[in-house]
């Protein structure tokens, strides 16, 4: 079996609310850490979410 190209990652809120999204990314084309601006329902505003490993 070949190694999977897409990997699951966790996007953790930078507002320190503990909220996170789980998404996939292509590990070959996106080698750097993913940063996205998304809605945090705990903080009730759009904040940056940074990539973290799923444990």
From Swiss-Prot:
Keyword set, alphabetical order: Methylation, Ribonucleoprotein, Ribosomal protein
Organism: Rhodopseudomonas palustris (strain ATCC BAA-98 / CGA009)
Record-given protein name: Large ribosomal subunit protein bL33
InterPro entries per UniProt: Ribosomal_bL33, Ribosomal_bL33_CS, Ribosomal_bL33_sf, Ribosomal_zn-bd
Post-translational note: The protein is methylated on either Ala-2 or Lys-3.
GO-annotated molecular function: structural constituent of ribosome
Keyword Isomerase applies: no
GO cellular component: cytosolic large ribosomal subunit
GO biological process: translation
UniProt family annotation: Belongs to the bacterial ribosomal protein bL33 family.
């Amino acid at each position: 079996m070949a190694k999977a190209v897409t990997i699951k990652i966790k996007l953790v809120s930078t507002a320190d609310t503990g909220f996170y999204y789980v998404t996939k990314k292509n590990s070959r084309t996106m080698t750097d850490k993913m940063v996205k601006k998304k809605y945090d329902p705990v903080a009730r505003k759009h904040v940056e979410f940074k990539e973290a490993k799923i444990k």
